[in-house]
Amino acid sequence: MDYKKSGVDIEAGYKSVELMKEAVKSTMREEVLGGIGGFSGAFSLAKIKEMEEPVLLSGTDGCGTKVKLAFIMDKHDTIGIDAVAMCVNDVVCAGGEPLFFLDYIACGKNYPEKIATIVGGVAEGCRQSECALIGGETAEHPGLMPQDEYDLAGFAVGVVDKKDLITGENIKPGDTLIGIASSGVHSNGFSLVRSVFTMTEESLNTYYDSLGKTLGEALLAPTKIYVKTMKEIKKAGVKVKGCSHITGGGFYENVPRMLPDGVKAVIKKDSYEVPPIFKMLAEDGNIEEHMMYNTFNMGIGLVLAVDPADVDTVMEAVKAAGETPYVIGSIEAGEKGVTLC
């Protein structure tokens, strides 16, 4: 008996690392110290001395059961983008700049080419976020997971000067809410998605005129990364008052997380066009409206609270970053929460 016969292929692990090296190298920043393969990733903080009071920020998350679609479609090149997005978008909600990222893949069996493809997606997410992929782990779990399946999670660290920290504490009645478009379902609510739609290769490869693509393409579209967007807003000289990443729990759970006591967010549902994938989900799954807005992002991946005087500047900055903004509502006095009207 040896380790390979028990289900763990060390040589496959070595091959995976070799295949992913170029992708990982493409994410490096000058602050990264050392090469690939060390016991820990090293990142110099010398540059943050320029900040008055640097604050480190962290975020960790995964892709949930969205990975099931990747298994069925045998498409693994974008799921890594989702893992990065879920973490760095949380970091930018506090006004931070992502510095580095680490990934964790647990798999039933290490197929080097597949693992390298997944990490290639992670690297792409890191490039979009301008953060370095400085470490990771691929763990083979024979007997615990099916051979063809895996789970993917990540961890991001960022930094912000304390004076630039977005806390939401200064949000007040009269402030404007700006929503930034999502790419679709992003990485939340997929357990419900998988209950609504038949999850077979045939069904996912079915083209729908209403979507302008196949169902699988619509669902597997990678989560938007809003790092560049927030940098553009900051470069424009605007201090965002509050920022919410619309993930699991939708508007109802996430928008209140940025609000102080005594104010509520009033969001106008007709202020933007809800993408067709959500309409299809609601109709095919007979899902009530409140549940839709309490589960999915409904086409809005990020919600900002800004001073009315800054609205035009923020809208232009978001567009300059290549994203689509909408004025979706305002802040009113009342019990902390969200009202959709």
Curated annotation (Swiss-Prot):
Q: InterPro entries, per this entry?
A: PurM-like_C_dom, PurM-like_C_sf, PurM-like_N, PurM-like_N_sf, PurM_cligase
The yes or no answer to whether the keyword Cell cycle is present is no
Which pathway does this polypeptide act in? Answer: Purine metabolism; IMP biosynthesis via de novo pathway; 5-amino-1-(5-phospho-D-ribosyl)imidazole from N(2)-formyl-N(1)-(5-phospho-D-ribosyl)glycinamide: step 2/2
Gene3D superfamilies for the chain: PurM-like C-terminal domain, PurM-like, N-terminal domain
Q: What is its EC number?
A: 6.3.3.1
Catalytic activity annotation: 2-formamido-N(1)-(5-O-phospho-beta-D-ribosyl)acetamidine + ATP = 5-amino-1-(5-phospho-beta-D-ribosyl)imidazole + ADP + phosphate + H(+)
Q: Name one GO cellular component term.
A: cytosol
Q: Which GO terms describe its molecular function?
A: ATP binding; phosphoribosylamine-glycine ligase activity; phosphoribosylformylglycinamidine cyclo-ligase activity
Superkingdom is: Bacteria
Q: Does the keyword Ligase apply?
A: yes
User: What are its GO biological-process terms?
Assistant: 'de novo' IMP biosynthetic process; adenine biosynthetic process
Q: Which CDD domains match?
A: PurM (cd02196)
- Compartments where located: Cytoplasm
| Chief place of localization | cytoplasm
User: Which keywords, in A-to-Z order, does the entry hold?
Assistant: ATP-binding, Cytoplasm, Ligase, Nucleotide-binding, Purine biosynthesis
HAMAP family per the record? AIRS (MF_00741)
Family to which the UniProt record says this protein belongs = Belongs to the AIR synthase family.
What protein name applies here?
Phosphoribosylformylglycinamidine cyclo-ligase
Q: Which gene encodes it?
A: purM
